[in-house]
């Protein structure tokens, strides 16, 4: 239910700025007719696009600022230059102030994460944030995290990611007990880093309401073996970019094959419906929109190079998680981890020592 929801938009974020943001808001407003938008950015650049979309214009308010964060800015630069004045900062701050239930930005990922952490702060029992998104699979979709927020996560943090990802999956898939798997180089218990093995041990032994499947490998992501795939941001981001590259390669191969001869062109026309269905399945815009989990507020990251269709999908994600009160569900799940803090911290220290010794040996 979207009644009463207000979404804050970074009107200047991404490669295409207001054109994509306003176009996406227009598409989203059809799917969510009761939604309202607070759009932050340069009014002289935003209003011309807004006036082309009267439906969005009627449910939007522009909050002017001529300061924006570029895609090239380092997080430290963005914080220094855009603190309290940039369109990205103001959109996130609207969530903190309770003026909006979620913020959506297609801007610089590092800057967005840095600002979100400064403004919203981390939840209790969470050390690092995780970026979670929907991933198309042979069985439908799964949740994968972390996709780049925390480059190196230890065992304790991976367990936190598992709890947050499980709550996210319950909300977006509307299922009671999603299955959770840890991404690893093999299914055997002896394989993997000390952190991954420690996380698996914790998830097996802890009295948590999580259906832990065990380890999953890279090919299990596309198979949809589990509902939630948990990994660190370094591995997750590489997996994401690899998958995006493979999709582009497959599409290029198909286009080349369909144009290779007259017979191929005729075959394409005969199978046009099937190709359209395949293209829809492979379209990354449908899965656009990743949520920063672990913060005291909802921030959704849209792909910087997406178009209006993709940005609308990111708004859809914001609406879904805000409507389902995702934050309270995550807090409840994380409270169940608080009793494990002492024992996990001890094992975490042992894990850190073991990894250090492995590096030095």
UniProtKB/Swiss-Prot annotation:
The keyword Mitochondrion does not apply. It is found in: Cytoplasm. It comes from the Bacteria. Its EC number is 2.3.1.274. Pathway: Lipid metabolism; phospholipid metabolism. It catalyses: a fatty acyl-[ACP] + phosphate = an acyl phosphate + holo-[ACP]. GO terms for cellular component: cytoplasm. InterPro entries: FA_synthesis, Phospholipid_synth_PlsX-like. Gene3D superfamilies: Isopropylmalate Dehydrogenase. The keyword Cytoplasm applies. GO terms for molecular function: phosphate:acyl-[acyl carrier protein] acyltransferase activity. It is an enzyme of class 2 (transferase). Keywords: Cytoplasm, Lipid biosynthesis, Lipid metabolism, Phospholipid biosynthesis, Phospholipid metabolism, Transferase. Its main location: cytoplasm. GO terms for biological process: fatty acid biosynthetic process; phospholipid biosynthetic process. Belongs to the PlsX family. Homodimer. Probably interacts with PlsY. HAMAP family: PlsX. Catalyzes the reversible formation of acyl-phosphate (acyl-PO(4)) from acyl-[acyl-carrier-protein] (acyl-ACP). This enzyme utilizes acyl-ACP as fatty acyl donor, but not acyl-CoA. This is Phosphate acyltransferase. The lineage of its organism: Bacteria, Pseudomonadati, Pseudomonadota, Alphaproteobacteria, Hyphomicrobiales. The gene is plsX.
């Amino acid at each position: 239910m979207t009644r009463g929801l207000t979404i804050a938009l970074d009107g200047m974020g991404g490669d295409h700025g207001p054109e994509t943001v306003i176009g996406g808001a227009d598409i989203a407003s059809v799917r969510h007719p009761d939604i309202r938008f607070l759009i932050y950015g340069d009014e002289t650049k935003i209003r011309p696009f807004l006036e082309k979309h009267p439906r969005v214009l009627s449910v939007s308010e522009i909050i002017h600022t001529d300061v924006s964060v570029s895609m090239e800015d380092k997080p430290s630069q963005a914080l220094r230059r855009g603190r309290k004045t940039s369109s990205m900062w103001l959109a996130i701050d609207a969530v903190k102030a309770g003026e909006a239930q979620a913020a959506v930005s297609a801007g610089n990922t590092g800057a967005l994460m840095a600002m979100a952490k400064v403004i919203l702060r981390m939840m209790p029992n969470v050390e690092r944030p995780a970026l979670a998104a929907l991933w198309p699979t042979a069985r439908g979709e799964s949740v994968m995290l972390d996709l780049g927020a925390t480059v190196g996560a230890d065992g304790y943090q991976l367990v936190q990611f598992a709890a947050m990802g499980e709550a996210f999956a319950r909300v977006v898939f509307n299922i009671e007990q999603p299955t959770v798997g840890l991404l690893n180089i093999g299914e055997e218990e002896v394989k993997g880093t000390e952190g991954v093995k420690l996380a698996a041990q914790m998830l097996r032994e802890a009295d948590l309401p999580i259906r832990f499947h065990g380890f999953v490998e890279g090919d299990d992501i596309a198979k949809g073996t589990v509902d939630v795939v948990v990994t660190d941001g370094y591995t997750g981001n590489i997996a994401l970019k690899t998958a995006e590259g493979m999709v582009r390669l497959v599409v290029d191969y198909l286009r080349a094959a369909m144009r290779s001869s007259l017979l191929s062109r005729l075959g394409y026309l005969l199978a046009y419906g099937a190709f359209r269905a395949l293209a829809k399945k492979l379209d990354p815009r449908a899965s656009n929109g990743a949520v920063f989990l672990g913060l005291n507020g909802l921030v959704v990251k849209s792909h910087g190079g997406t178009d209006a269709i993709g940005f609308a999908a990111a708004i859809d994600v914001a609406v879904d998680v805000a409507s389902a009160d995702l934050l309270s569900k995550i807090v409840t799940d994380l409270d169940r981890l608080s009793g494990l803090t002492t024992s996990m911290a001890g094992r975490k220290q042992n894990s850190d020592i073991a990894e250090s010794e492995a590096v030095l040996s």
